[in-house]
Amino acid sequence: MDWLREAADGSLVLSLHVQPGAKKTEFVGPHGEAMKLRLAAPPVDGKANAALTVFLAAFCGVGRSAVSLLSGETSRAKRVRIEGAGSEALARLRALG
């Protein structure tokens, strides 16, 4: 899985292709070397990035502050770090594809 990596410090690094303005927020499936994610939030004033952070934190069972955007603040291609995600969260992410 090229889109999901474990860093040396134990955090997870995700490569995502984000589609803002969708009907609902959900993982779609592989998109090249990234995982495609639809976001219900519009790409205006950072709302999509905030929604992404909230969604990933809830999906992985971590606090919102544990999710940080590494790159792609204004792009659909994003790299995200998730700190403190346990083995259950890793298994859920791996099950996506």
Swiss-Prot record:
Gene Ontology CC annotation, any one: cytoplasm
InterPro entries to which the protein is assigned, alphabetical: DUF167, YggU-like_sf
SUPFAM superfamilies: YggU-like (SSF69786)
Superkingdom in the source lineage: Bacteria
Cysteine disulfide links: none
NCBIfam families: DUF167 family protein (TIGR00251)
Record-linked HAMAP family: UPF0235 (MF_00634)
PANTHER family from the UniProt entry: UPF0235 PROTEIN C15ORF40
Family: Belongs to the UPF0235 family.
Protein name: UPF0235 protein AZOSEA09540
Higher taxonomy: Bacteria, Pseudomonadati, Pseudomonadota, Betaproteobacteria, Rhodocyclales
